[in-house]
């Protein structure tokens, strides 16, 4: 059973995985993927959510190695899943993705085909629409026309190359959600999300169909500042029910 932090060689470099040990007897693991320019800590909230979810499964958190290109993040996510399976054979494996990490998780789940469940936290349905919405008109135009953008702010330095956008074009997220069925999907979103509009969660749920469980929290923001504990409790209960009912 996974208990301790571990490091392995991923496709783009070393990946360190922090483990919240499973407090149950379930042979189950939840892997968490962070959002755009985020981290496995998510301002401290991710550790709290992991502690809640560990009532039913070991929880693995990691940082993408710096790439913002979603195809490369998918490669790293597949590598983490493979490493978890090698370290805990036969486990029921769940995937939680936040924001852009949720989009990477949708792609990964559709390609993997053997996950026990998927949790989408503030996850977009249309990637280009999302970034056209949150970037300035000038930033989006420059990036879309082939210019590299450099950011240096409170989250550090980051270069966005034009293939950040063009890489999105090969992925139809609603179609991938449909391909992943009958995978159970829990969707968590805040109605006042200022980055990924709540209507995107509704479209994701519609794409999933009967296997979707959608919860939209009144007000709130993209970071779930008001609702992190409540959302964590809800997803922990969902994990417990999925494992108890034997659907995994």
How would you name each of these model-derived features?
Residues 53, 108-109:
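Aromatic pocket-lining residues of Rossmann-like dinucleotide-binding sites
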Residues 43-47, 71-74, 198-202:
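Short, surface-exposed alpha-helical segments at coil->helix boundaries
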Residues 15, 94, 103, 112-217, ...:
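The alpha/beta-hydrolase serine catalytic core
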Residues 36, 63-67, 124, 220:
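Short beta-to-alpha linker loops that shape the active-site pocket of alpha/beta-hydrolase fold enzymes
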Residues 60-91:
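Catalytic nucleophile-loop/oxyanion-hole region of alpha/beta-hydrolase
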Residues 12-14, 23-55, 59-64:
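Short, surface-exposed "cap/lid" segments of acyl-processing enzymes
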Residues 97-107:
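Glycine-rich nucleophile elbow surrounding the catalytic serine of serine-hydrolase chemistry
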Residues 1-24:
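N-terminal cap/lid segment of alpha/beta-hydrolase-fold proteins
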């Amino acid at each position: 059973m996974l208990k301790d932090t571990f490091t392995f060689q991923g496709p783009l470099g070393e990946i360190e995985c922090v483990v919240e040990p499973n407090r149950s007897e379930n042979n189950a693991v939840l892997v968490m993927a962070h959002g755009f320019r985020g981290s496995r800590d998510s301002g401290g909230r991710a550790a709290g959510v992991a502690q809640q979810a560990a009532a039913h499964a070991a929880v693995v958190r990691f940082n993408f190695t710096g790439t913002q290109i979603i195809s490369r993040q998918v490669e790293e996510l597949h590598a983490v899943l493979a490493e978890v399976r090698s370290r805990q054979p036969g486990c029921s494996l769940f995937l939680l993705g936040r924001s852009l990490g949720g989009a990477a998780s949708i792609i990964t789940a559709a390609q993997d085909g053997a996950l026990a469940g998927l949790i989408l936290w503030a996850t977009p349905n249309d990637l280009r629409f999302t970034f056209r919405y949150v970037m300035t008109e000038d930033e989006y135009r420059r990036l879309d026309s082939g210019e590299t953008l450099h950011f240096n702010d409170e989250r550090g330095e980051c270069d966005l190359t034009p293939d950040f956008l063009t890489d999105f074009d090969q992925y139809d997220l609603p179609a991938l959600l449909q391909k992943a069925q009958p995978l159970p999907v829990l969707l968590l979103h805040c109605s006042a999300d200022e980055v990924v509009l709540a209507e995107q969660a509704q479209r994701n749920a519609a794409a999933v169909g009967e296997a979707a469980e959608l919860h939209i929290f009144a007000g709130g923001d993209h970071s779930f500042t008001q609702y992190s504990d409540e959302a964590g409790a809800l997803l922990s209960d969902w994990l417990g029910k999925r494992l108890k009912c034997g659907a995994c």
